[in-house]
């Protein structure tokens, strides 16, 4: 379940028509959770590493040189890009495990080259990138898979040349918290009808098993290293900064989180990417507890007004997850259902309607839509009009496009 989401600049019922609120830089009426797509940057490396481990296409102990010539593109790591003469601040040859922890673009490039574009593309599809979650809210963006060329495929390994929504990232990361099983995000957990004395309650909805539990566990171990390794970890603070002592930045009650940091270039309206020193999207995903996460935290900051520091994110993550951990076993049910009976949902006639809109409608009633085919209209439905079903019932929708049967999960 999505427990909380927020964004700034914000819009509320109180300031909806306020001119000053609307004139804030980057103001939008859209939800950044699902109505905005962007190039996510290096947090995508979590999916690449899990995919490479699952397909046995990476040896974590093997070493590589941290510069790659790819056609007319030279892929450097961040420490070489930041130096005036292109020299490395860290060793020029590292292992793939070290490369992940230091967020090496060159290392991820070599992994994709070893996997091949077709295999990497198949894993992106297993994680359902390019596919909306259909959480029941309108205006959801689809994101986009990388173009079918070698450079775009390579760049997608470090989160450029591919676009996602925040909720698509979170859907993919649910597999890290569920032993490889991916869950569809839910924003409504329960619906109570006091007039009828009934309730509908959602349960976990498995929508994929993109990689093995072993691949997930090994990737999470590397993510712990991102936060705890004093040499390679990008969220390990080596010197005092912003009032923080040296050490891991993401901590709950003295225990580390599993972390991946990200920096993404932003596409310019005129083509190419923005060139300013801080014209980036900075981000981090943190999972706690790392061995079997109860909570997944993701935050990004676009073009920060002050000099960028990862502490801007850790200062939000640490107290928030600490508080969530404290109350997770105390949290009362949103609505007491004692004395109520399980409700039913009456199906409508969906034939001729857009499958996406139908899916949103079904999801709002805590049903589980399954779209078959790639068409623009529903031609048949598995549950007839007027039939009553309980919450979480799968409803298959056949479309007028190519009939591709999706994977089915319990």
What are these regions (language model features)?
Residues 211-218, 312-316, 354:
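Short amphipathic alpha-helical segments
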Residues 299-301, 308-311, 318-410:
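Ligand-recognition elements built from short beta-strands and adjacent flexible loops
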Residues 16-18, 179-180, 193, 231-233, ...:
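Short, surface-exposed linear patches
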Residues 1-42, 47-301:
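Beta-lactam-recognizing serine transpeptidase/beta-lactamase-like catalytic domain environment
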Residues 279, 285, 306-309, 313:
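Outer/extracellular conduits and scaffolds centered on Gram-negative outer-membrane beta-barrels
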